[in-house]
Amino acid sequence: MYSSLLSIACGAVLGAWLRWFVGLKFNSTFQNFPLGTILVNLVGGFIIGFAIALFANMQLSSNYKLFVITGFCGALTTFSTFSAEVIDLLQQQKYGFAIALITIHLMGSLLCTVLGLLSYQWLSQH
């Protein structure tokens, strides 16, 4: 039990630090488009897709899965920030930006998760 908690906590610390750093570096790039939030959600989608395939095909301690998926990806990706940014755009009546942001986050994250799965499959065959 304690090793599981420690695995999640260590992954979460690294994921949160990376999310903070990427947001700090990229969220001010475009005025109406929070690029940092988009990047962490897309990268997190890719990592989780790759990790799901990896853990399904390797016999590893469940602590690795807890570290990567629950801890790291859970802290790296951010649905609440995405939601707040969309609401902010809607309140400013920037409907086109809000729809674009929703589309990029949802479709992009799904696509990146599939790409993560396919990347693992490709790498495991070569």
Swiss-Prot record:
Transmembrane segments: 4-24, 35-55, 67-87, 97-117
Activity modulation notes: Na(+) is not transported, but it plays an essential structural role and its presence is essential for fluoride channel function.
One GO-annotated biological process of the protein: cellular detoxification of fluoride
InterPro entries: FluC
Signal sequence bounds: none
Keywords: Cell inner membrane, Cell membrane, Ion channel, Ion transport, Membrane, Metal-binding, Sodium, Transmembrane, Transmembrane helix, Transport
The keyword Membrane is assigned to this record: yes
Reaction catalysis annotation: fluoride(in) = fluoride(out)
GO MF term set: fluoride channel activity; metal ion binding
Membrane topology: Multi-pass membrane protein
Superkingdom per UniProt: Bacteria
UniProt subcellular location: Cell inner membrane
GO CC list: plasma membrane
Binding site for Na(+): G74, T77
Function text: Fluoride-specific ion channel. Important for reducing fluoride concentration in the cell, thus reducing its toxicity.
Family: Belongs to the fluoride channel Fluc/FEX (TC 1.A.43) family.
Protein name: Fluoride-specific ion channel FluC
